[in-house]
Amino acid sequence: VYFEASPRWALDQPYQQSASKGYEADGLLYLKSGSKEQNILAKQGDDLRIDWGYFYMVAGKENTAYSVGNSTELRKNFVNGTLNSASLEGEDSNGNMALVRSHGKVKNVTDKIMLGYDDIYSIQYFGTNLRPYWNSKGDRTIEAEMLAAYNEYDKLLARCYAFDKKLMEDASAAGGKEYAELCALAYRQSIAAHKLVEAPNGDLLWLSKENNSNGCINTVDLTYPSAPLYLIYNPELEKGMMNGIFHYSESGKWTKPFAAHDLGTYPLANGQVYGGDMPVEESGNML
């Protein structure tokens, strides 16, 4: 089975320069790619893609071949029966990454590869760059996290299946099949539009991005309509959506006698950027 990933996973624009490589760690094979510039937290806005940090594609070493190169050549080599595992570095259009998992002659087989992203620093929060929550102290490695996920795969998958089943059953009982499908879609959409980090004072921050609107971060009128999901499934994340707004007022950085609209433009949470205050709407939402 052939898997291929493009360096564009880690770029904002296709013309940006990138570098890819393959390596081995703890019995796993890694393919890694990122931009050459690595300007961390240098961009803010709506229709933008992250271009700092690194994308990873990972598989077990046994029965695996991997290579870095031009997409056409990689696919040609696969069709001809082999990847050039000596080619483990490449740049730009020669930086596509390919994995081949070989299972011989089989009818049904279960297998896995892993995709991951280490953004190094995720959010700028009132001038302080914050790491992703899983590495908030800077003492973890992406390789250790990948290895743990690989080893715990069966348990993690069982938990995912159990949660999927419960969500669909509860939502179906509340509103029928179509309602349940909407709830499943909303669950994925909402969670995917947030980033989990820890504030310097230890507060949990679950920061939204206002996608295809204006790119604001931690917008209060996004927090409010998504609240039912988090109040049901994880109230701590709901607190994480509110902590930053409270801090903004309590610190004196926000001086008006009502709630702010946002904390900035994603991923820079340094203060409201929205041009018009919404004192009634946002204060009501926070209450």
Positions of the model-derived regions?
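Acidic/polar, glycine-enriched structural segments that form the non-catalytic walls/loops
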Residues: 2-218
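Aromatic-rich carbohydrate-recognition surfaces in CAZymes
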Residues: 105, 134-157, 215-287
